[in-house]
From Swiss-Prot:
Its main location: membrane. This is Neprilysin-1. The chain crosses the membrane at residues 114-134. It is found in: Cell membrane.
Amino acid sequence: MSQQHEATAAAAEKPLNNGYLQANAPLEELSATVVSPLLGQQQVQHQAPHQMQQQQQQQQQNKLPTVVFLAPDGSGGVGIQRGNPAQGNPGMVTGTGSHSDWLLKESQQRRRLLVLAIAFTVLGAAIGALAIYFASVHQRCHLYRLEPDNDDRPNGRWNQDSGSAHEGQDNICMTQECVRTAASLLSAMDLNSDPCEDFFQYACGTWNKMHPIPEDRSSISTFEVLSDQQQVILRAVLEEPIDERDNKATIKAKTFFKSCMDIPQIRKIGTGRLKQVLQSLGGWPVIERNWSPPADLSVERLMGQLRLNYSEPVMIELYVGADDKNSSVNILQMDQLQYALPSRDYYLKESSANDRRAYHRYMTQVALLLGADPATAAAELEKVVLFETQLVNVSLPEADRHDTSLVYRKMLLPELQELVPEVQWQEYLQAALGPGIPLQEDEPLVTYGLHYLTEMGKILAHTDRRVVHNYMLWRLVMSLMSHMIDEYQRERVEFRKILMGIQSERTRWSQCVEWTNKKLGVAVGALFIRDNFNQESKEVALEMIHTIRAAFNELLAENDWMDDETRAVAKEKADSMNERIGYPELLTNATELEQEYVNLTIVPDNFINNVLSILQWESEKMLRLLRQPVDKEKWTTEPAVVNAFYNPNKNDIVFPAGILQPLFYSQHFPKSLNYGGIGVVIGHEITHGFDDKGRQFDKEGNMMQWWNNATIEAFRERTQCVIDQYSRYKINEVDMFMDGRMTQGENIADNGGLKQAFRAYKKWETLHGREQQLPGLNMTHDQLFFLNYAQIWCGSMRPEDALTKIRSAVHSPGFVRVLGPLSNSRDFASAYKCPLGSTMNPAEKCSVW
């Protein structure tokens, strides 16, 4: 999910400040930790008002302003810095041999006094700023009806309406964790906005101002900041010297990362290995002076070799996976092509002509770098773009492919040969599987793009072989370009400037961390969990899953559009969901972990060879599943990612270790924040089992119609309400509206997850009582639940990224994920006392689950 900022080695060595204390950190009832690049970490004790006033007067007399800012690591911690943060730390004056000892000591003493003076000034300013800020918050909260009614006051001890800071003060949490959490929430908010008109601006307005989009990415969000923080951790564990705790798997991960970082060695190797690969595949015609089609390499054989040896599915998406109608059996599956550009609209819409020109230029410049003739390369590759556009044109738009049952088609190999006679399917599939997996004469297979395959065959039959060969090898070259450096990287950046709006490439270390985690994720996960995963998180998450699933079942029993029989089967499916939390157990078993990578060779001094080895290893590992039963207990995602998943074929919900952290979860958070964070994520994944796709699969993971027709029609009516609602959200960056069809499954899950998590939280509150309030916020925990949910989606995007999201993303942009579910929530409207008819409390709401 992200591209990363530069981080220092020192930052990698320290525990991250995520806005809460580590589990073993000492707690002080009335103190707060302030982190400043100038002074390091300081303990700030609460002081008497006259002391605060004196320090504020001293600050006003000083010429340099005091700046309150978010910690530069994006953690949400609050720092205080004197002067202009961009100027950096002042240099230290050191003594020379010409000074006497007493002068040196006096100089050192003066410096100490100066540092102490600055420290006291900064700490006083911090307290003064917080006092003023909290007073402002108190006033704003009353202005926008954040105060609860009398009936909401816990035991009548806290009289919010009076504004008293003394009555019921034991109900205010003043631990370091609570102060930090409150400061983190406040630092993101725009208190000048009305929460009943634009809750995204209210919750995230200041965060978005404080986090401009970096040059090396097309968007910024809290998700990406969390991923940035996690990448710093992963960098640290990958850079650790190999020691006795390592096994063959973790050594391979560290070795791959090291080879990726070895730029001098990569330069030394150059492009020789890439050119060898192209030559072994018949040569790339555009860079060959006298190219002719190899007699022993048909189009079908070349497609198969690209799939088997380089994980490159050209023209056809081919893979082995669970049969949707028999989820215990692996089967060959084929689908329409993967696009080189983000979506089919980039090839077909007139408004994307500039993107197509940039794509053609990128293709041409790379070919020139590899030795193509400048006089002919552009014209030759223009034919490639036209050929690719023809293929894209006969593919179906993703919005028309949401109903899996309509695109699923199971058949035997001879039937496919009869339907698409232009392709020699036996030759292609055997080349893709390799000699170790003999293809059966009546091999069963599933297609999800039969219309595309039929039309593709016709296009192939009428296209010159040179054009086809040029296209196929270009797709391999394009995939490998992200791993190239220097002039190849510069051409890629120029292309991405047009396509994505980015202005520079990411730092090398962040690229290497991402590739290592994606390619060797299980081994990286084993390194990550050693010191960066709290087992208590797993237990708490499991407890929350049970309470949120119970809330789903309650809501299921209350809905009035489902018949009793279907409702009973739906409950069975929800109760049968398997939970996978944190990481698979094999991460702690060195023997099993080593077996995972037993057929993979990684060398310390040849990065491009390592990349090619991994591509072949990945492909062979996946294709070997063909004759094997489906292992429904096996994890299919790496543990160190900030995400969560639902798999319809396994009916399981997965919450990797990477997402069990703030803002989603912390053992120090109030329950309202945890339920508004990871709780909504849990509800979201549960609801995926019943969205427009998930509802087509039973509790065993098999696609079948287990709803009656009346219930299906009622579901579609409610789904259409969601589609229509989200299609009315306008993306101002490009002056276009959302396509509610593309994102319907995720929108249904967002709305259902929010409702379930809030109900589960209220049940927890009934059983355990109300928690202490957070200081300075003057907000109820119901309000904090929705605030934390909203702040998960803080962020902004470039126009280029906005266009890509509209055209191809299955998730709505962050602001829509806030406004949509909250405006459908009666619980939210009640918590914030939004008048009926206000923007965030419309009279007509959409509800599916």
